[in-house]
């Protein structure tokens, strides 16, 4: 989600353009929950949006850490590449936070439709 549903590339210089595309998030949630409903608990479905937010924050931290430690882990295009990635992931996480109610509603709708289908 942090990659596929982001409205921009992960290294877009205009970080403020980063954000979650709810249509793509819906497609992901639909497919994921449909295939895992038999094993998925309601609590897990209810935290699907939060898990996407957490992953965006975690990756922002990893990009920033790599930048501060001299760009040893991630392949970079230039000396600010990981810093640019950090900013995009933070902007994505902020947008997810703003849209969390919608993300939760999407996951809940999918859960309700598929919890007994398996």
Locations of regions flagged by a protein language model:
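ATP/Mg2+ or Mg2+-diphosphate-binding catalytic cores
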Residues: 58-118
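All-alpha amphipathic helical-bundle segments outside canonical DNA-binding/catalytic cores
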Residues: 40-52
């Amino acid at each position: 989600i942090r990659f596929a549903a982001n409205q921009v590339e992960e290294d877009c210089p205009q970080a403020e353009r980063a954000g979650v595309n709810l249509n793509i998030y819906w497609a992901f949630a639909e497919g994921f929950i449909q295939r895992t409903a038999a094993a998925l608990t309601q609590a897990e479905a209810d935290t699907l949006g939060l898990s996407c937010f957490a992953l965006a924050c975690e990756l922002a931290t990893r990009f920033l850490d790599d930048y501060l430690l001299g760009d040893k882990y991630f392949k970079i295009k230039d000396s600010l590449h990981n810093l640019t990635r950090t900013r995009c992931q933070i902007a994505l996480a902020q947008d997810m936070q703003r849209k969390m109610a919608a993300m939760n509603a999407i996951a809940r709708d999918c859960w309700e439709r598929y919890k007994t289908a398996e």
